[in-house]
Amino acid sequence: MYNFKHITYKEIPKLIEYNKQTYPERGGYTKSIIDFWVARHSEAVSDILTVEKDGKFYGQEFYSKMAFYYKGVYEESHWCFDLIVDQKLRKDCIGLDFMQYALEEYPNYYCTGSGPDAVKLHLALGKQLLGDIRKYVGLVNPLWLATSLFRGKIAKSKYPRTIDHVWRKVESFVEMPKLEQPFNVNLFEVSRDAEFFQWRFFNDFHPYVVYVNDTTGTYFVVTTIVQKHITAIVLLDFRCSLNDTKAFEQILKATHKLANKIYIPIVICGSSHTLIDRVLESNHYISIGRPRPIIGTKKYKGAGYEKNKKEQDFSRCTCISDQFFNHWEYC
């Protein structure tokens, strides 16, 4: 009989081996990724669920504490990702049973990136489609294409201290302004609490760089990745007002200047809001790949996702998924 359970610290080595087999494309990073994950807080390990039989894992799902604002009201929840059940068990509905177990443990969960079959299961369990995230790619300066070949990731020390005397590079978490209120009262906006921000963007696992506007309190986070041997810059996360296009246009302009300063030809950005779509497309960005669905709680039915996307007021604003960039997805 297959058991569904929360794992313990002593089972971490077994979890690492299961992930090596399940996600071979992660290569030697598997242990580092899981170690990074469980280092977030004392309960991080127990928020990992597994399908287990006779001491062997056959499936998993990771949950993480998150919080969001909706209509200005703060609510705690969980984000889930890396849901997988071994292929041979799916015909026996083990995956659905596992998801039902997870729903009992984490009833108010959100997720993104699910494939078509998983989306059907989420919806069958009472969740709803709230929107989607699109991956955009823009060519900022073709002159740097040759110099970015085989260059690798860019170290934090190579980024400028300021951009246009407006954006300041944040060297440590203590320099960050407190993010205690939403930038957009009428949107679904995922919170950026201090514990999350310090763990996620001020770590030694990956060279994230944070820039902040001390006048407005807006910020953005960038990093570099290598795809097809070309180094690109990723606009990974940001917060700003979306009442109009101005604030995000300033962030995008700063990102373009930054890319030119460190000789990067390509910028990658995700969008879960129609306003951001418009700004990116007006700057000749191209949407590539399939839109990644955002799944959430049923009680927000009617609050948001419109298939024509003309007036979408329920949106992640903006949580760009690392999954787009060959890392773990986390919001």
Task: Kindly give the residue locations of the regions a language model identified.
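Extreme N-terminal starter segment of soluble prokaryotic enzymes
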Residues: 1-4
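Amide-forming acyltransferase catalytic core, primarily the GNAT-like/NAT-type
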Residues: 7, 11-55, 127-236
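Contiguous, function-dense segments enriched for cysteine-driven chemistry
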Residues: 15, 42-44, 61-62, 75, ...
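N-terminal/domain-start segments enriched in small and hydrophobic, helix-friendly residues
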Residues: 31-41, 61-85
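Active-site/acyl-donor-binding loops of N-acyltransferases
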Residues: 40, 65, 108-160, 221-245, ...
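Conserved GNAT-family N-acetyltransferase fold
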Residues: 49, 59-61, 78, 83, ...
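Conserved acetyl-CoA-binding loop-helix of GNAT-fold acetyltransferases
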Residues: 82-104, 245-257
